């Protein structure tokens, strides 16, 4: 087994003895597992295997994502942080110099995040409604990246509204879109085109990527604020 750097800073490729490749992040909190992920040690460092079936961002990277604006030192607003599966890998990437402000609507789900953030001090959990960014405006500074994973019909509008308040000029948004959450009566491709048009009303749309086979009827969009 060996580990090499991915072209995205903070992401690694683990090559198993059978030649299969997986992606991973270097564990910011050695010894901590967040979601039962496989942890390996290589040359004195600990790496957490990033499971693409549990993380839309992980799926996007494995599917050949070209634009990944989250880097070491980035400040990230994470909408729909849930119990922190993907956010824990983002935490590894941004490191102690970076910060994640994670908004979650469900108190029950946010409670599951508490044991993780006790050790991962670069994650700030916020109980809030992503459709109402004014509600957490006092808690979140201007950010480099907004990542959104909120399965709601208005998910494109949610990203735009939050970007107007929090995203730096030239900053990036990333949004995981589940077509069935927007309109179950339409074909996914039709829904994705409508979302792209809505996003393009405010952002420059940089990339769109299918998350199949890891997530059915999902796409990830990368956008840039002018």
Curated annotation (Swiss-Prot):
The keyword rRNA processing applies. S-adenosyl-L-methionine binds at residues 85-86, 104-105, 129-130, 149-152. It is an enzyme of class 2 (transferase). GO terms for molecular function: histone H2AQ104 methyltransferase activity; RNA binding; rRNA methyltransferase activity. Coiled coil: none annotated. Keywords: Methyltransferase, RNA-binding, rRNA processing, Transferase, tRNA processing. Its EC number is 2.1.1.-. InterPro entries: Fibrillarin, Fibrillarin_CS, SAM-dependent_MTases_sf. It comes from the Archaea. GO terms for biological process: box C/D sno(s)RNA 3'-end processing; tRNA processing. Interacts with nop5. Component of box C/D small ribonucleoprotein (sRNP) particles that contain rpl7ae, FlpA and nop5, plus a guide RNA. Involved in pre-rRNA and tRNA processing. Utilizes the methyl donor S-adenosyl-L-methionine to catalyze the site-specific 2'-hydroxyl methylation of ribose moieties in rRNA and tRNA. Site specificity is provided by a guide RNA that base pairs with the substrate. Methylation occurs at a characteristic distance from the sequence involved in base pairing with the guide RNA. PANTHER family: FIBRILLARIN, RRNA 2-O-METHYLTRANSFERASE FIBRILLARIN. Belongs to the methyltransferase superfamily. Fibrillarin family. This is Fibrillarin-like rRNA/tRNA 2'-O-methyltransferase. It comes from Thermococcus gammatolerans (strain DSM 15229 / JCM 11827 / EJ3). The gene is flpA.
């Amino acid at each position: 087994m060996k580990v090499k750097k991915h072209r995205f800073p903070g992401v690694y490729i683990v090559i198993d003895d059978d030649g299969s490749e997986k992606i991973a992040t270097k564990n910011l909190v050695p010894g901590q597992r967040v979601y039962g992920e496989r942890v390996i040690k290589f040359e004195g460092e600990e790496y957490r295997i990033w499971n693409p079936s549990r993380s839309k961002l992980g799926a996007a990277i494995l599917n050949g994502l070209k634009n990944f604006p989250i880097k070491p030192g980035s400040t990230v607003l994470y909408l729909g942080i849930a119990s922190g599966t993907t956010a824990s890998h983002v935490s590894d990437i941004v490191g102690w110099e970076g910060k994640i402000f994670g908004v979650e609507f469900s108190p029950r789900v946010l409670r599951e995040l508490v044991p993780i953030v006790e050790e991962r001090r670069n994650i700030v959990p916020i109980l809030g409604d992503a459709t109402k960014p004014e509600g957490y405006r006092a808690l979140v500074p201007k950010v480099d990246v907004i990542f959104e994973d909120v399965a709601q019909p208005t998910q494109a509008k949610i990203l735009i509204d939050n970007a107007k308040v929090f995203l730096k000029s030239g900053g990036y948004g990333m949004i995981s879109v589940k077509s069935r959450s927007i309109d179950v009566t339409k074909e996914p491709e039709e829904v994705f085109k409508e979302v792209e048009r809505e996003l393009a009303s405010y952002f420059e749309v940089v990339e769109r990527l299918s998350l199949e086979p890891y997530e059915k009827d999902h796409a990830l969009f990368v956008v840039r604020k002018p």
